[in-house]
Amino acid sequence: MELPRFATFLKDVIKEAGQVSLHLFKIMIPILIGVKILQQAGLIAYLAMPLDPVMRIMGLPGETGLVWATAMVNNLYSAIIVFLSLSESMQLSVAQVTVLSTVMLVAHGLPIEVKIAQSAGTRFLFQALTRIGGGFVLGWILHLTYSLTGTLQQANTIFWQGDVPAQPPPLPMWAAEQIKNLALIFCIILVLVVLMRIMHKLRIVDGLTWLLRPVLRFLGIGREAATLTIIGMVMGLTYGGGLIIQESRSGTVEARDVFASLTLMGLTHSLIEDTLLLTMIGAHLSGILWARLLFSLLVVAGLVRLLPLLPGGFVHHTLFAKEGEPSADRGA
């Protein structure tokens, strides 16, 4: 590649990565601050109280509601810290840890991740309820399956070797950590933008779409959203969702595909990192990977087939914005 062309290419990808990152940061920074305030004020514990009976239906001690509430409001790492602090007093089985880990994987980081999905054109309330409700239904199914078959009933073993902090880090340290995380997000998005351009140039995207055609047809996801969906499922909703925001604003991806893609990404994403993370506290792959993946595919396939049967007004009011209609925070 000639030097002037390379300079133009570099300028373009940095600009695109900057635009994607800026959209994400506008969403993430206020929510990060809000969640930190909730954490500092000790309010997350109150959010966990209504979850006590819900956790018991899934065969879990009521105390695990605090773990799931922490995951939903904050992130998996914070939830794991809470889990480790409670684990000695709870004496859970592998099946119970797998159920808890699976519901955490389906519904975590909701303020940021659902807001990202909304920014791309889906409806906030539906996405949030789908993930919370989906986590509960899947957790209940796993609980029944493990209980009726007598599977994974042995005492759980925790492999996590990290230290459990006695208290949250001071605010300056927390702020520095968030800035580092945001910088890392920009770097990863920059790499993804470069990879996407290379894959389009080499027609790798066309090859992937052809290979995944049966699955995409089953899910009702168009080829334009295929690669972005894969990125989100493998790497995380922040990255896949961030790229879809850019594509949806340019009109490249249809609203129906955005809805199907982001719903699938919401239910199952970060298939490698998050799955490995939860195995460190003893969760079994049968729940946190295979059941989660199968459940997510079936839910999205069912929703896509249900869409044509629903009134258009209900769909656009409840599920996703009309084609060309700005979402709640577009243009911000």
Across the structure, where does each feature detected by a protein language model lie?
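Alpha-helical transmembrane segments of polytopic integral membrane proteins
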Residues: 27, 31-34, 40, 44, ...
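Alpha-helical membrane segments and immediately flanking helix-loop junctions
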Residues: 61-120, 218-278
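Transmembrane helix-loop-helix hairpins in multi-pass inner-membrane proteins
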Residues: 107-165, 273, 278-310, 318
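Selected transmembrane alpha-helices and immediately adjacent juxtamembrane segments
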Residues: 1-54, 132-140, 144-216, 294, ...
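Small-residue-enriched transmembrane helix starts and helix-helix packing motifs
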Residues: 13, 50-69, 174, 225
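Membrane-water interface at transmembrane helix exits
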Residues: 31, 35-39, 83-87, 117, ...
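Hydrophobic alpha-helical transmembrane segments
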Residues: 25, 39-51, 68-83, 98-99, 124-134, 173-176, ...
